[in-house]
Amino acid sequence: MHNWIIIGGIQGMTLATFLRKQKGVAPEEMAIIDPHEEPLSEWRRCTEAISMPFLRSPFVHHLDVDPFSLNRHAKASLFGEGASFFGKFKRPSLLLFHEHCEHLVREQEIRRSWIQGRVESIKRLENGWKIHLENGSLVMGANVVLAIGAGEQLHWPEWAQQLQTDSPGSIFHVFDKELPKFDASQAPFTIIGGGITAVLLTLKLHKQFPGQVTLLKRHPFRVHDFDSDPGWLGPKYQQAFHNTRSYVRRREMIVAARRKGSITRELNAALRKQLRQFPRLVADGHVHKANRQKGITSLFDEDGSLIHQTGTAILATGFQPQLPGSSWLAPIIEEHRLPCAACGYPVVTHTLQWGPGLYVMGPLAELEVGPIARNISGAREAASRILQAQ
């Protein structure tokens, strides 16, 4: 039996690093369950799909325990410190961040703990938990940490679902595993969205296919350096959040704090620079219906008026807000009467304990950690709290 079973990707990797370095947990004492063959492969796939050059978070947010670990790694790397960070907040390049992650994977022997598989069910034992995987394997451990994200819950608006049903291959989600190569898709391209993912993808495709790309957004660009106020990283906002006993109110605070669909200043500047030469690169419109005839996809608003026509539509519409892993979480919530708020998310202790030997991170922890829960900063906070309970 393992001491720790961690279910999840980048959040779980953060906890694994903290357990190895701060608690001396050996690789064979941990089991990291993930559907993918390699650590962080899904994170890499998504960030590479949009050619993200720099992370949105500052240099102290990464998977290692020491906040300055990434900075030291940059000084010792081939990239050099000057080319590795952007702006006054020293946001790390994606290449540096990936290299640092791989360094930690090797250094902490994470692959020795890696188990590729999908969770089918979880059962409580007298002294721990038993995880059933879809491939028939069983994994048992004293403590289980649910660090699952929302990465497999892609948001497809109703009109997009209908278009995909009626005309397969005419529309994709940018984070779809089946996303084809762009040069094999029909131009022109229309990106649906208005946030950082949409703008990064627009700039990427515009470079490949100049004059054949349009970003279709339904709201003005919301320009912010970060996806929530930095005050949420400390007591400035966290104190009031934790003093709030109502979980309905906490959910309202989380929704209000998130700068959903926002972009950074340098992306806004880069897009506006291209707009001077290509004024049709960005258009406004809220799609309610779509159809495809004779190889052309037509997009319509709620009044049925034509907004735009395209060859291939690509959604950059984010993820669905419901509870991650609900299909296999629902039975254990009911069986063990695990506390949940009205929104369906876990109600946990300060150390993120949901039940005996059962802990949460990421989206599942946001009613306790706050709006940063889904970010790398939230992963570090969650890992620190879980270790406090040991």
Where are these regions (language model features)?
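A conserved beta-strand/loop capping segment in the N-terminal third of enzymes
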Residues: L63-L95
